[in-house]
């Protein structure tokens, strides 16, 4: 038997088929292909003709694990047939280069490193991810034969994958051409609905064909290619419509926007694997490398050089960054977009007129910037991206006959850069260096042979060359770039709007450079703003400021604090120059506020993490510290929405920490209590509810397991009840669950946990209320004798006089007349006071006095108590009732203590009884049970009138909270009144 089994294709190969396959591989390697056939939009994938200009897709089951080990056959096939063979060939070339390396110790060290790692991991992920090995990888990639092999492996590999897993080959849900439908309103917009193999919609895919003013891209050999048309596809980031997986494999288009031949097709592939909730998650991206972008803006299109040709990919710079961030998130890895930025930084403009130069990335210290070979991928893009230094072909020796910049520019821009760099190297006087740069800028703008696009491209190249030149000191770099900007300002031939584009692109070069300090970037940016504000017309000035603002916001090489400073400077200058409309000022201020909020959020989460991971603090201390942070956020100047976002990050961080579940729940409880108890004057009730919903959303969307999330949700509710939060706050927890990006079963589980916590809290409140009444005889009457009280008043009044008299017995040295006078005065005072008190006492005992019998006093007290209780009943709100208690029962001393205490006892009785229990009609109409549902269910069919309810307290279960507050106020008032005893009396001293 001469057949072989191919595990990838899951079928047997005869010897004849094997030879045919090998022959096809040889054809790819030698580039002796069959006549090129162009695929059309209606083409169906077959084994004989696989490449199509339209995207291909499949809806499959399977997932990919965080450790990059996947069970999905398509993702696995891409790795095994494309990525791993490319790695193997690359390592083989690296080993050859090491064998020829002069430094034998280094060569042996790297050889051992490769061999040892290969025994553990054949993918050599660590080796390829180590920046220290970049020079060996780059050198290997310069080999033309290796480049040819890598490109061939990619083309043949995609053919194998697409054929093996195509629907036409019988693979369930396999690759098939997209059936685009044109939008009626515009022929350049197309869409298609992507469904899984069960027929459920996964997403709607949109394609836009962009027909732009031609712009140029430089190939590795220095030749330029014009781009006039490309397409953008809105790759989905998150999918939540249906379960399943999806692979979108989008063919790269030629420079003119047309379809490639079948034997040269390469693809940008997005792998969406089934996640824990069943929905597709973006787990991996496969694309040729190095991937470059036609500009610095998020709308810049991606392109590659493959087989000596330029191809555009259907992804923009902004979409690529967004996808990479989602890939890292779904792989459980940290996101460091600054690394991705090293690959994709470029210079240029917006879609209206991109400016693309050969230098598409930020170089570190090259002199001059040099082109770099562009090759296919060697690692999947979900692995850490390594910085790539953009290079040009090695410059030739500077021609000694090039006497000035204008002469140099007559050859090429590269000749001009060579001339400038030679002069910067030779000249050590910084002033002369700056003059040379200014001379070069003038030559570029005065070159009559160049159109405006070429002038723009050359000015940007000169600015980048200045920023990255290692022979310039930092201050000289600032002065050099400022000289370029000043030259742009003074040029009389360049239209203002074109100057605006030059300024914006130059600022992008400045801010995205790793060779400048923040203060140097600040100086250059302010100069660019000044030049922009000097333009002749308002429109150009406004466009310049707005464009520079966008560059500041989009750069990834600045911290939020640095962005705040730069954006604030731009805003200030724009306002002072009165070139920004109120709407533009407001928009820029909104961006500034957003950056500020992001910085606050970042700083806050850092503090939270420091607390969570502090080994010396226990849970109680962690809770206290995080409560303090929460309170600071709530007191801050940010909007309620921003505060909610920050609180959501806090709860999400706590939930995702490695602490025990009960410890996390305790901390979350503290956060809930802090929000609930926060001052209503500084944070309105609706805003509290909004923030509480965000707090729960942070818990619900955390990556921790469901039981832990349920426990933390209960903790949040407990915190609300501890903080005496109202119904709106508790209800907000449910809102946070509803708005969370989790599946329905998880939402239901969290809502049950929330309801259970509410019921338990209500039970505790009821039990505490019952305990508060134990041992109290509310009906007990405690009369006091008025006569005794009046007598005591006389004693208290006379006592100070007696004390003064006793003091007068002390030895004196005054004259006899003075002693007699003072003694007489004291005796007169005693006599008057005694007569007054005795007369009052007699008046009380007289028939016309106000001394009543006990029966009369009791009747009068009952009447007064009833009046007070009735007046209390007219107060509808808890606040009014609390005010009544203080004013009429505590502060009003004209009422007897007995009347006030009886009133309190009666009010407590009414609160305890809760009249609704005695009124069945009220019970069935108004009462709500703990779960929050409005209808009560009978306990049994035999007793339909006995309804299952925890407690009835008026028209809303929330009134239980109000009743508890009133009862507390009444009990407190009772204690205060009872303390009004004889403790202020002073007993009569007796000898």
UniProtKB/Swiss-Prot annotation:
Organism per entry: Rickettsia sibirica
Pfam families in the record: 120_Rick_ant
This protein's GO CC annotations: cytoplasm
Subcellular location(s) of the protein: Cytoplasm
Coiled coil regions, renumbered to chain: none
Keyword vocabulary terms for this entry: Cytoplasm
Name used for this protein in its record: Antigenic heat-stable 120 kDa protein
The keyword Cytoplasm is assigned to this record: yes
Residue stretches of biased makeup (Polar residues): 348-373
Domain of life the protein comes from: Bacteria
Basic and acidic residues bias locations: 12-29
UniProt key word Transferase: no
Region called Disordered, residue ranges: 1-37, 54-73, 348-384
Primary site of residence: cytoplasm
């Amino acid at each position: 038997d001469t057949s072989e089994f191919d595990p990838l294709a899951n079928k047997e190969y005869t010897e004849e088929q094997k030879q045919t396959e090998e022959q096809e591989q040889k054809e790819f390697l030698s580039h002796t292909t069959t006549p090129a056939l162009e695929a059309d939009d209606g083409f169906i994938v077959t084994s004989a003709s696989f490449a199509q200009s339209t995207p291909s897709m499949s809806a499959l089951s399977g997932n990919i694990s965080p450790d990059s080990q996947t069970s999905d056959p398509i993702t696995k096939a891409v790795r095994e047939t494309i990525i791993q063979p490319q790695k193997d060939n690359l390592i083989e070339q690296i080993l050859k280069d090491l064998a020829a390396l002069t430094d034998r110790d280094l060569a042996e060290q790297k050889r051992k490193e490769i061999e040892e790692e290969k025994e553990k991991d054949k993918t050599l992920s660590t080796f390829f991810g180590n920046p220290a090995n970049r020079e060996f990888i780059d050198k290997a990639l310069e080999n033309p034969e290796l480049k040819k092999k890598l490109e061939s492996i990619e083309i043949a590999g995609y053919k194998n994958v697409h054929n093996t897993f195509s629907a036409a080959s019988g693979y369930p849900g396999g690759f098939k051409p997209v059936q685009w439908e044109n939008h009626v309103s515009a022929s350049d917009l197309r869409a298609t609905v992507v469904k899984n193999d069960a027929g459920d919609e996964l997403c709607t895919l949109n394609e836009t064909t962009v027909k732009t003013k031609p712009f140029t891209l430089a190939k590795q050999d220095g030749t330029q290619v014009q781009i006039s048309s490309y397409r953008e596809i809105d790759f989905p980031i998150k999918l939540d419509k249906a379960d399943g997986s999806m692979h979108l494999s989008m063919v790269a288009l030629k420079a003119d926007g047309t379809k490639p031949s079948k034997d040269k097709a390469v693809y940008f592939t997005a792998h969406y694997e089934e996640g824990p909730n069943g929905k597709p998650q973006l787990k991996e991206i496969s694309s040729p490398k190095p991937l470059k972008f036609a500009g610095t803006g998020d709308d810049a299109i991606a392109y590659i050089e493959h087989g000596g040709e330029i191809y555009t990919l259907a992804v923009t710079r902004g979409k690529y960054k967004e996808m990479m961030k989602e890939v890292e998130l779904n792989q459980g890895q940290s996101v460091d977009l600054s690394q991705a930025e090293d690959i994709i930084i470029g210079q240029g403009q917006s879609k209206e007129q991109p400016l693309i130069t050969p230098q598409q990335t930020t170089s570190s210290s090259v002199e001059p910037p040099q082109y770099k070979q562009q090759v296919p991928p060697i690692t999947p893009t979900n692995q850490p991206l390594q910085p790539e230094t953009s290079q040009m072909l090695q410059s030739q020796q500077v021609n000694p006959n090039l006497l000035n910049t204008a002469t140099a520019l007559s050859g090429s821009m590269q000749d001009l850069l060579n001339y400038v760099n030679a002069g910067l190297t030779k000249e050590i006087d910084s002033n002369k260096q700056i003059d040379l740069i200014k001379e070069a800028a003038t030559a570029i703008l005065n070159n009559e042979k160049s159109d405006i696009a070429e002038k723009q491209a050359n000015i940007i190249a000169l600015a980048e060359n200045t920023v990255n030149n290692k022979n310039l000191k930092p201050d000289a770099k600032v002065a050099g770039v400022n000289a370029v900007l000043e030259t742009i300002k003074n040029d009389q031939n360049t239209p203002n709007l074109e100057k605006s584009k030059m300024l914006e692109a130059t600022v992008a070069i400045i801010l995205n450079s790793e060779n400048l300090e923040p203060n140097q970037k600040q100086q250059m940016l302010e100069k660019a703003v000044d030049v922009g504000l000097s333009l002749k017309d308002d429109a150009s000035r406004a466009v310049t400021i707005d464009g520079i603002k966008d560059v500041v916001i989009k750069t990834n090489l600045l911290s939020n604090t640095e962005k705040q400073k730069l954006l604030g400077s731009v805003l200030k200058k724009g306002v002072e120059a009165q070139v920004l409309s109120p709407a533009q000022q407001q928009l820029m201020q909104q961006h500034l506020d957003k950056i500020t909020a992001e910085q606050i959020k970042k700083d806050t989460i850092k503090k939270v993490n420091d607390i969570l991971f502090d080994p010396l603090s226990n849970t109680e201390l962690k809770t206290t510290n995080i409560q303090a942070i929460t309170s600071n956020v709530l007191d801050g100047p940010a909007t309620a929405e921003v505060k909610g976002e920050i609180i959501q990050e806090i709860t999400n961080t706590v939930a995702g920490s490695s602490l025990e579940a009960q410890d996390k729940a305790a901390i979350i409880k503290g956060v809930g209590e802090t929000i609930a108890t926060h001052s209503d004057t500084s944070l309105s009730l609706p805003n509290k509810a909004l923030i509480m919903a965000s707090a729960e959303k942070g818990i619900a969307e955390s990556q921790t397991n469901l039981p832990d999330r349920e426990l933390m949700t209960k903790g949040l509710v407990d915190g609300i009840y501890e903080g005496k939060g109202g119904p709106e706050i508790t209800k907000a927890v449910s809102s946070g669950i509803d708005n969370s990006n989790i599946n329905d079963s998880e939402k239901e589980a969290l809502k049950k946990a929330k309801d259970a916590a509410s019921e338990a809290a209500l039970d505790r409140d009821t039990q505490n209320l019952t305990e508060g009444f134990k041992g109290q005889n509310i009906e007990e009457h405690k009369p006091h004798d008025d006569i005794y009280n009046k007598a005591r008043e006389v004693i208290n009044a006379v006592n100070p006089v007696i004390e003064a008299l006793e003091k007068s017995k002390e030895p004196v040295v005054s004259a006899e007349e003075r002693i007699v006078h003072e003694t007489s005065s004291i005796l007169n005072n005693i006599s008057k006071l005694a007569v007054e008190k005795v007369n009052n006492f007699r008046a009380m005992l007289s028939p016309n006095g106000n001394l009543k019998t006990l029966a009369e006093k009791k009747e009068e007290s009952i009447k007064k108590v009833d009046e007070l209780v009735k007046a209390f009943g007219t107060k509808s709100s808890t606040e009014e009732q609390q005010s009544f208690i203080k004013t009429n029962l505590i502060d009003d001393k004209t009422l007897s203590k007995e009347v006030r205490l009886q009133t309190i006892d009666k009010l407590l009785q009414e609160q305890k009884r809760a009249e609704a229990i005695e009124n069945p009609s009220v019970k069935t109409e108004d009462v709500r049970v703990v779960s929050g549902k409005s209808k009560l269910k009978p306990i049994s069919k035999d007793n339909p009138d006995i309804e299952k309810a925890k407690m009835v307290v008026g028209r809303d279960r929330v009134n239980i909270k109000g009743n508890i507050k009133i009862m507390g106020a009444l009990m407190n008032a009772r204690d205060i009144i009872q303390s009004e005893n004889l403790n202020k009396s002073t007993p009569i001293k007796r000898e």
